[in-house]
């Protein structure tokens, strides 16, 4: 649900102070300050888990696999100043305008979807009738639409994962599994 909106700054509880950064990740304390009393609801806990994984992904994982450079060749984290991206695993420099495209970053997501669903046995037939326990930042009424979109994302074959251009698959899997273990051992 947090990704099914154009208002990701709101749905991901991002701190507006960091709006100019390339990596803007969820501020979990903003979420728990508002919804701590609802965390016993499985959909709210799932929302929190999503934010936790996003935070770890953007704060810890992405900086290990790519570097962002300005036009003078200096590393920068200011989005407006980035001109070049270095993809470490593939030892490739690309123009920043190509990075967030289907050819690279977003394309890797597409190529991984079917593989990840099968690897982690992610159920696809979920009940869309989820009652909103009091969350204001996402639309619980959009669940069926999200599930329909999920099926569209699975149109690529499982072996498409062998053609990633940004993400080192084994490192990504190890990181996601580690983040999940850490979350489960201490969710709050």
Predicted segment positions?
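N-terminal leader/auxiliary helical segments
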Residues: 1-188
């Amino acid at each position: 649900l947090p990704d099914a909106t154009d208002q990701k700054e709101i749905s991901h509880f991002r701190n507006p102070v960091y709006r100019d950064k390339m990596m803007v990740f969820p501020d979990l304390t903003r979420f728990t300050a508002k919804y701590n009393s609802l965390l016993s609801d499985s959909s709210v806990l799932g929302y929190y888990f999503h934010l936790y994984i996003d935070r770890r992904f953007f704060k810890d994982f992405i900086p290990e696999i790519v570097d962002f450079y300005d036009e003078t060749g200096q590393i920068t984290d200011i989005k407006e100043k980035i001109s070049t991206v270095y993809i470490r695993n593939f030892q490739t420099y690309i123009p920043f305008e190509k990075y967030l495209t289907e050819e690279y970053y977003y394309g890797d997501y597409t190529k991984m979807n079917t593989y990840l669903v099968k690897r982690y046995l992610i159920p696809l037939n979920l009940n869309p009738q989820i009652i909103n326990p009091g969350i204001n930042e996402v639309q619980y009424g959009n669940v069926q639409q999200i599930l329909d979109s999920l099926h569209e994302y699975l149109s690529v074959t499982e072996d498409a994962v062998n053609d990633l251009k940004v993400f080192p698959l084994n490192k990504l899997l190890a990181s996601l599994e580690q983040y999940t273990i850490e979350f489960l051992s201490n969710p709050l």
